[in-house]
C-alpha cells in the first residue's frame, strides 16, 4: 500500500508542477483596479474561510497561457475559450475546498503536524521530484516553464502532504476479511489463471438488427464468414474477414457485451442472434480460444488482499470526506465564475 500511495502522491505532485503559476498583474489605472476587484471576488466559503477568484486563478496560469496560444490575446471574446476556463476554475475550486475541509478535520483529529514537519515532508517530496530529472538544469528549466520558483512550488506541495497524512489516519484501521477475498476470487477467476485466457474473434458489424439476422441466416446455409464480412461489414476489419486478433478475457478495450458474447462461443461457432453495442449490431465468430487453469487461491490471496485493501481504504476515505463536507457549511458561488 505504501508504494501505491507514493505513486499516487507523485501523480498529484506532477500535476501541481504543470498547473501552479501566480498570475502577474497587467494593465494600469482603471483596468488594474477592475482586475484587482475581480481577483478579490469571493467564489466559495468553507467554514469561515473565504476563497477568492484570484486564489483560484493563481493555480491556472499555465491554462491561461495555453488558451492564449490557441485563441490569441483576445481569448475573452471567445465563448469556447471562456467555457474551458470556467470548467478549469471549478475543478481547481473543488480541490481547494477539499483541501480546507481535510486540513480542518485533520486538525480536529490531532494528526496535522507542526508547520516545520509539513515543510520537511514537502521538501522530501520536492527532492523526489528533483530525482526524476537527469540534471539540475533540466529541473530548473521545468520550474521556469511552469512559471514557478522552487519556493512557490514548495508551497503548492503542502496541501497534498497534509491530505496524505490525514488519509493515512482515516484508513489506518481498514481491514479485509477472508470472506471478501474468497468472494472476489470466485468472481474474478479470469484474472487469476496460469496464463491469460484469451479469445480470437471475428465479427461482421452492420447498422441494423435485421441486417445481422440476414447474415446469420446466410451463415446457417453454409456461406463463408470471411466473405460475408468483406461483403457486408462496415468497419475496417471487413478486409481481413472481420478478424480482431487475440483479446484477453480481462481486456477493457472492448464493449463488455461484445466480449462476453465472444468468450461464450466455442471455437468455430458464431452467435445465433445479433449482438447489440453502441457501434451497431454484430455477428461474432470464434476463430480460436485459449483457456488455462485457475491458480489456487493461496497463490493469489495476498494480491487480492492488497487490491481489496486499496478499494476499502478508498471507499472509507470518500465516505469520511463526504461526511466532513456536509458539516463544512460549504457555499459555492458558481455564478461569480465566468
Model segments located where?
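N-terminal targeting/tethering segments
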Residues: 33-152
Amino acid at each position: 500500500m505504501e508504494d501505491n500511495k507514493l505513486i499516487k502522491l507523485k501523480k498529484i505532485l506532477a500535476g501541481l508542477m504543470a498547473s501552479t503559476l501566480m498570475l502577474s498583474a497587467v494593465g494600469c489605472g482603471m483596468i488594474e483596479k477592475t482586475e484587482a476587484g475581480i481577483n478579490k471576488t469571493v467564489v466559495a466559503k468553507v467554514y469561515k474561510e473565504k476563497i477568492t477568484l484570484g486564489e483560484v486563478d493563481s493555480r491556472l496560469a499555465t491554462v491561461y497561457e495555453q488558451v492564449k496560444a490557441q485563441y490569441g490575446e483576445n481569448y475573452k471574446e471567445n465563448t469556447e475559450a471562456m467555457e474551458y476556463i470556467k470548467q478549469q476554475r471549478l475543478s481547481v475550486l473543488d480541490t481547494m475546498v477539499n483541501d480546507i475541509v481535510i486540513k480542518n478535520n485533520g486538525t480536529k483529529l490531532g494528526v496535522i503536524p507542526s508547520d516545520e514537519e509539513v515543510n520537511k515532508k514537502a521538501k522530501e517530496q520536492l527532492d523526489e521530484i528533483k530525482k526524476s530529472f537527469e540534471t539540475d538544469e533540466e529541473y530548473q528549466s521545468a520550474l521556469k516553464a511552469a512559471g514557478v520558483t522552487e519556493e512557490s512550488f514548495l508551497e503548492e506541495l503542502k496541501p497534498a502532504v497534509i491530505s496524505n497524512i490525514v488519509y493515512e489516519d482515516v484508513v489506518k484501521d481498514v481491514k479485509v476479511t477472508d470472506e471478501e477475498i474468497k468472494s472476489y476470487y470466485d468472481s474474478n477467476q479470469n484474472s487469476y489463471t496460469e496464463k491469460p485466457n484469451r479469445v480470437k474473434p471475428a465479427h461482421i458489424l452492420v447498422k441494423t438488427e435485421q441486417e445481422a439476422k440476414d447474415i446469420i441466416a446466410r451463415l446457417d446455409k453454409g456461406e463463408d464468414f470471411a466473405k460475408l464480412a468483406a461483403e457486408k461489414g462496415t468497419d475496417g476489419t471487413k478486409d481481413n474477414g472481420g478478424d480482431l486478433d487475440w483479446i484477453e478475457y480481462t481486456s477493457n478495450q472492448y464493449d463488455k457485451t461484445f466480449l462476453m458474447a465472444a468468450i461464450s462461443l466455442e471455437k468455430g461457432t458464431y452467435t445465433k442472434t445479433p449482438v447489440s453495442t453502441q457501434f451497431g449490431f454484430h455477428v461474432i465468430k470464434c476463430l480460436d480460444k485459449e483457456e488455462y487453469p485457475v491458480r489456487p487461491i493461496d497463490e493469489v490471496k495476498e494480491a487480492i488482499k492488497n487490491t481489496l485493501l486499496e478499494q476499502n481504504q478508498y471507499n472509507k476515505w470518500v465516505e469520511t470526506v463526504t461526511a466532513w463536507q456536509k458539516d463544512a457549511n460549504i457555499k459555492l458561488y458558481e455564478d461569480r465564475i465566468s
